[in-house]
Amino acid sequence: MLRKVRIIFAAVFFFFITLLFLDFTGTIHSWMGWMARIQFIPAVLALNAGVVAALVILTLLLGRVYCSVICPIGVFQDIISWGHGKTKRKNRFRFSYSPAKDWLRYGFLVLFIVSLVAGTGSVAALLAPYSSYGRIASNLFAPVYAAGNNVLAYFAERLDSYAFYSTEVWIKSIPTFIIALLTFAVIFYLSWKNGRTYCNTVCPVGTILGFVSRYSFFKPVIDTEKCRNCGLCGRQCKASCINMKEHEIDYSRCVACMDCLEACNEGAISYRFSLPWKRKAEEGSTNEEKGPAENDGRRAFITAAALVTSAAALKSQEIKRDGGLAPVIGKKAPERGTALTPAGSSGHRHFYQHCTACQLCVSACPYGVLRPSTALDTLMQPEMSYERGYCRPGCTKCSEICPAGAIRKISREEKSSIQIGHAVVNLDMCIVNRDDVQCGNCACHCPAGAISMIPRDPDDKKSRKIPVVDPERCIGCGACENLCPSRPLSAIHVEGHEMHRTI
């Protein structure tokens, strides 16, 4: 029964979290965006103490339920492992106990924490489980989903139905796509062969919650009087944490999947209340060494302190400051001296230190402005570019859904007064000078009224007019760059500000 309940909840979470990355209409984000905000790493980086405390308490009460129900990469592994189990009957019972690889677990955890403190967000993003699944969903699943939608839109249009509409299918970043593909391949292989190996050797969240779950109040317990040593529970344990020879369970690796309860035909395993200190006393009577238990507490304390310290350090480092005339040829991105980050991110320092590169904002951006960065120091973290669209002043979608607090929630009014960059004109590329034609497209579409058209020849008021930008009024939305008819590079482009300003 408990296993079925776990599967139902896991399916619901997995379905809607995946849909957050697939839904290009933005409908699902208004209802299910909270599922992204309760993910562990984004909650830590956002200093969302309520969510972090709730997840720790949940783990202390019920074990690593987060890993088996809420975490999408965990459920994804279960789906792959289940699929392998369905190929042959013997594959259902292919697992066996293996000792914990602590040097790997703690090594990856230290690397993750050090990368957070050092500000190398790209390294941390590679290890963060929610971010890993976000890259897989947005880079591998989303194009397939969009292509399927376009097929339905094609047939619906011929039936005079507009229930579906076509959307553009494109790869936003080749390096991020390759990383997502490699991540998918590694997780698929590990899950297909060994179940939850990734969770218990690589995932930093699994290691952190493993410290807590050692002392959980409810957990699977083996009744040695009922046990017949058949080994079925151990052979179906995808976490490989049941040592049948010693009748012990490594609770730091147990993900509370309840598979062992269903596998046991004798009812020798039950999920029940067990006082941590009482259990430790019982273990101590049969085990002469007390060191490991003491070390567990030290590790848990050190890890928690390191996480809180690193998150607080990131928070303290924040600095708050007010502040068709051409052929249809594809646009190329200009070489920007300073990258553009979304309104609400405050600037580069805050954004890059808090962003987990989960790709949720990239998937949700309705105008194709956000895409993963290819720069080494900000690899996979979103950046703005205006070849396919521009950032509407009335759109605040990315600020509404960011689970890590890298993009703070702002109103439409606030966004209209935030300057993320300013436009720069290259008069040599402007078609007024290059092709000797009239234009003014940039000035017509500037929502801030920051672009004026003045005579090219100051002495001849009838001469063709060229654009001039008022940098004090420009908010960096990119409308001018996107709608400029010059190809392949726009004659006007936006340079970002490392620190956003209020105008």
Per-region residue spans from a language model:
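Non-ligating segments of multi-cofactor redox enzymes
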Residues: 1-247, 252-253, 259-503
